[in-house]
């Protein structure tokens, strides 16, 4: 009788311990997204978590405010690219799962800072920046979202609608039929030249520099670009550079310049070889 009672108590203790373990595990489970697909224009807690996790990983540099604007959209696309996912700018279940796996989210801290109106960051691997001051008094800091005015066309800061159109023309003329990544890479080369002292400092100057682009020489620059070409330009402007910081590219099947073969090669995407 005594032995039976003792065995019963041991089993009871073990079961109680397991129950407490799983209860605690469930209670301390990392907060994660709801089931909705989060997309541009969305607002609320899911967007706050999305922005915080993207910022934790270094993809989002804007204000964590729960508003899914352009800054959040492009940060999400860059995350999807870097993690080898479908690049659609939508936070579906696969993307959310990968974000949860790759980042941490301190919901209590973020919620507290937002409720207090503080300026703060949520970057991983470093001290958080909280100045304790409200954002309600204005300020000149760039939030990473389109907060100023209401432009008729969404154009990234620093570029005119004409710049976007001209670059889309160049990408379409130079790289239509190439993989999307290759089209973004061509747009990135234009931007890399724009930021190099070796080339003109305007989009039109780079594109129309003599003998710079085949599409200008053969007139294909004036073909009407499709939406994919424009999207490739916007992806490049917002930080995606599949070219590896290339300044040149060429098609080895059609290149007639011996000089281009002397350039250090970075990679090949589709039919184009990208070079330093």
From Swiss-Prot:
Q: InterPro entries per the record? A: Cell_wall_hydrolase_SleB (IPR011105), Peptidoglycan-bd-like (IPR002477), PGBD-like_sf (IPR036365), PGBDSf (IPR036366), SleB_dom1 (IPR042047), Spore_cortex_SleB (IPR014224)
Q: Which keywords appear in this protein's UniProt record, sorted alphabetically?
A: Cell wall biogenesis/degradation, Germination, Hydrolase, Signal, Sporulation
Domain of life where this protein originates:
Bacteria
Single GO MF descriptor? hydrolase activity
A Pfam family: PG_binding_1
Signal sequence span per UniProt?
1-25
Region called Disordered, residue ranges? 118-158
Q: Which GO terms describe its biological process?
A: cell wall organization; spore germination; sporulation resulting in formation of a cellular spore
Which family does the entry's similarity section mention? Belongs to the SleB family.
> What does the UniProt function comment say about this protein?
Required for spore cortex hydrolysis during germination.
Name of the protein described by the UniProt record = Spore cortex-lytic enzyme
Which species?
A: Oceanobacillus iheyensis (strain DSM 14371 / CIP 107618 / JCM 11309 / KCTC 3954 / HTE831)
Lineage, opening ranks:
Bacteria, Bacillati, Bacillota, Bacilli, Bacillales
């Amino acid at each position: 009788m005594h032995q039976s009672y003792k065995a019963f108590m041991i089993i009871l203790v073990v079961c109680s311990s397991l129950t407490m373990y799983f209860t605690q595990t469930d209670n301390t489970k990392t907060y994660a997204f709801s089931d909705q697909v989060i997309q541009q224009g969305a607002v609320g807690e899911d967007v706050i978590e999305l922005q915080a996790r993207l910022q934790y990983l270094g993809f989002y540099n804007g204000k964590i405010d729960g508003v899914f604007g352009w800054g959040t959209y492009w940060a999400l696309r860059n995350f999807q690219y870097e993690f080898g996912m479908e690049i659609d700018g939508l936070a579906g279940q696969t993307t959310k799962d990968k974000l949860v796996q790759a980042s941490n989210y301190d919901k209590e801290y973020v919620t507290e800072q937002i409720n207090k109106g503080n300026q703060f960051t949520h970057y991983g691997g470093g001290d958080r920046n909280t100045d304790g001051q409200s954002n309600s008094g204005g300020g000149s800091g760039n939030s990473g979202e389109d907060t100023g005015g209401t432009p008729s066309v969404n154009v990234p800061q620093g570029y005119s609608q004409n710049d976007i159109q001209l670059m889309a023309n160049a990408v379409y003329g130079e790289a239509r039929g190439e993989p999307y990544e290759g089209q973004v890479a061509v747009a990135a080369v234009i931007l890399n030249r724009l930021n190099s002292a070796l080339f003109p400092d305007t989009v039109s100057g780079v594109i129309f520099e003599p003998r710079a682009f085949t599409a200008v020489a053969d007139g294909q620059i004036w073909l009407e670009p499709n939406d994919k070409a424009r999207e490739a330009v916007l992806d490049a402007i917002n930080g995606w550079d599949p070219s590896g910081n290339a300044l040149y590219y060429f098609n080895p099947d059609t290149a007639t310049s011996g000089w281009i073969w002397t350039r250090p090669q970075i990679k090949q995407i589709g039919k184009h070889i990208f070079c330093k």
